[in-house]
Amino acid sequence: MRQYEIMVILDPTLDERTVAPSLDTFLNVVRGDGGTVSKVEVWGKRRLAYEIAKHTEGIYAVIDVVAAPATVSELDRQLGLNESVLRTKVLRTGAR
């Protein structure tokens, strides 16, 4: 098991109060494979550095998880298939 930090940028038209519960459904992949979710932090709506899918703003969320590499890969795949997710970035924390 490794530590990861996942940043997700969501469609700005979503209601910010529904972001954490909707991310929680994706995080069941991590919990189902024996991983743990340390933190889910919703930063709120922020301006993007450049336009993504005709949006100039996005709702940022940062998630800290401890999981196997295959589990995180599956989570990233599922997030990428969701139309309300504009961009994801997975970083391994605590490496070396």
From Swiss-Prot:
Cited function: Binds together with bS18 to 16S ribosomal RNA.
Ranges that cross the membrane: none
Family to which the UniProt record says this protein belongs: Belongs to the bacterial ribosomal protein bS6 family.
Protein name per UniProt: Small ribosomal subunit protein bS6
GO molecular function: small ribosomal subunit rRNA binding; structural constituent of ribosome
Any single GO CC term annotated in Swiss-Prot or TrEMBL for this entry: ribosome
One of the GO BP terms on file: translation
InterPro entries reported for this sequence: Ribosomal_bS6, Ribosomal_bS6_CS, Ribosomal_bS6_sf, Ribosomal_S6_plastid/chlpt, Transl_elong_EF1B/ribsomal_bS6
